[in-house]
């Protein structure tokens, strides 16, 4: 099976989100046949992660992806001002058997994660995994050695010990710089000779060639202009920093083909330009999904009656991965976000029922408005849905 994977990295420079900025970032950048989309954001405003922001990049991106990309949110996490969002086709929900996270903090001696990395591993129904790592390393042209050191301390986020990893993608604002003066680089950009700097004066290329960092990782050919630092609202270099390709996307693994790699000059909300890459990953076909939790099909329900759903749990699942913090949620039939339900209860609050000699667990929900829904069982330890009902309808009672 071939998976098409699209990856974005965007340093937001603490700028507020709006629907136009998100549309400019994503529109035209995602192939209709893409299976997974990973988005790494750096320098997200603190108000978005600790509360206070009414509109956030994460919610606005998710809304756009649901409406325009026909994608559902599979995973989301953050560390300080860094965020990772993973989206996938709805039919892939059952192929994700486990999601794991790793974090590494580098700011203030490891006290905070403003600089650092987030690793996300998707374990598939086939015996393979896909890893995404989003990093924001220390700034400054003089800090090449510290960036290399941060790579080595952050390497654990790529799950290097896991032999099941079929493909690993490492992206973010690496902050590697061009070792040249500002005016020379700007002049080369204007006369179209800036790409020659990649082979002679660019720090990430040096790190790859000299094997100082990202050993075993590769990069598609860079054919775009430096992504930092531009004047907000334009694509013009502001001349206050040496123009550099700070924002990059690397890959490692068997059966990976790079399909495209570019910056996005339509997205000008920040002093960075976002970078987007598309890949094809060849992996063995996955077996038909086998849910750990099986829901009994629900008939049409009335809003005036508490919703009662029944399900059975695989005993081996609960023995190995079950938790009192597992929860059952009511999701819209579109399942825009696998991590957030419209209503939910802890599995520990469910009660047992015996129907015709078979044992079920039952969950109950009140005040569910009319609409089309599904019930889902979310595993606290596996960080994903391990059971999903068929669509059912709730209607107003005549």
Swiss-Prot record:
- Keyword Hydrolase attached: yes
Give the recorded effect for residue 175 to A. Loss of phosphatase activity
- By its UniProt entry, which PANTHER family does this protein fall under? INOSITOL 5-PHOSPHATASE, INOSITOL POLYPHOSPHATE 5-PHOSPHATASE
Please describe what this protein does: Dephosphorylates a number of phosphatidylinositols. Controls the cellular levels and subcellular distribution of phosphatidylinositol 3,5-bisphosphate and phosphatidylinositol 3,4,5-trisphosphate. Has a role in sperm activation and motility. Influences the localization of the transient receptor potential polycystin (TRPP) complex proteins lov-1 and pkd-2.
The source organism is Caenorhabditis elegans
Protein name per UniProt: Inositol polyphosphate 5-phosphatase
Enzyme class of the recorded protein, top EC level: hydrolase
Q: Which UniProt keywords apply?
A: Cytoplasm, Hydrolase
UniProt family annotation: Belongs to the inositol 1,4,5-trisphosphate 5-phosphatase type II family.
Q: Which gene encodes it?
A: inpp-5K
Molecular-function annotations in GO? inositol-1,4,5-trisphosphate 5-phosphatase activity; phosphatidylinositol phosphate phosphatase activity; phosphatidylinositol-4,5-bisphosphate 5-phosphatase activity
* InterPro entries per record: Endo/exonu/phosph_ase_sf (IPR036691), IP5 (IPR046985), IPPc (IPR000300), SKICH (IPR041611)
Its EC number is 3.1.3.-
């Amino acid at each position: 099976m071939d998976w098409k994977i699209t990856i974005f990295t965007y340093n937001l420079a603490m700028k507020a989100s709006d629907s136009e900025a998100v549309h400019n970032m994503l529109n035209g950048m995602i192939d209709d046949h893409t299976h997974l989309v990973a988005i790494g954001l750096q320098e997200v405003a603190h108000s978005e992660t600790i509360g206070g922001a009414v509109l956030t990049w994460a919610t606005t991106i998710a809304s756009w992806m649901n409406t325009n990309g026909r994608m559902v949110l599979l995973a989301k996490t953050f560390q300080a001002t860094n965020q990772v969002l993973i989206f996938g086709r709805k039919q892939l929900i059952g192929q994700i058997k486990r999601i794991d996270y790793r974090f590494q903090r580098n700011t203030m001696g490891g006290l905070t994660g403003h600089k650092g990395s987030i690793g996300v591993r998707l374990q598939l129904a086939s015996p393979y995994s896909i890893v995404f790592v989003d990093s924001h390393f220390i700034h400054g042209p003089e800090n090449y050695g510290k960036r290399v050191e941060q790579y080595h301390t952050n390497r654990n986020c790529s799950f290097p010990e896991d032999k099941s990893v079929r493909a690993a993608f490492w992206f973010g604002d690496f902050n590697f710089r061009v070792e040249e003066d500002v005016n020379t680089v700007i002049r080369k950009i204007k006369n179209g000779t800036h790409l020659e700097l990649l082979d002679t004066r660019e720090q990430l290329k040096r790190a790859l060639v000299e094997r100082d960092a990202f050993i075993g990782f590769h990069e598609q050919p860079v054919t775009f202009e430096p992504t930092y630092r531009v004047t907000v609202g334009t694509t013009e270099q502001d001349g206050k920093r040496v123009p550099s390709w700070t924002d990059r996307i690397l890959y490692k693994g068997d059966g990976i083909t790079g399909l495209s790699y570019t910056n996005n000059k339509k997205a000008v909300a920040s002093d960075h330009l976002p970078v987007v890459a598309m890949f094809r990953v060849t992996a063995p076909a996955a077996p038909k999904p086998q849910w750990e939790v099986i829901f009994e099909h629900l008939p049409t329900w009335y809003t005036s009656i508490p919703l009662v759903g029944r399900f059975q749990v695989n005993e081996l699942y609960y023995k190995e991965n079950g938790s009192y913090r597992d929860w059952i949620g009511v999701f819209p039939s579109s399942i825009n976000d696998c991590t957030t339900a419209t209503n939910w209860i802890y599995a520990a609050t469910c009660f047992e029922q015996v129907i015709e000699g078979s044992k079920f667990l039952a969950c109950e929900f009140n005040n569910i408005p009319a609409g089309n829904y599904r019930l889902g069982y979310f595993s606290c330890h596996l960080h994903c849905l391990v059971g999903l009902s068929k669509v059912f309808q709730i209607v107003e009672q005549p």
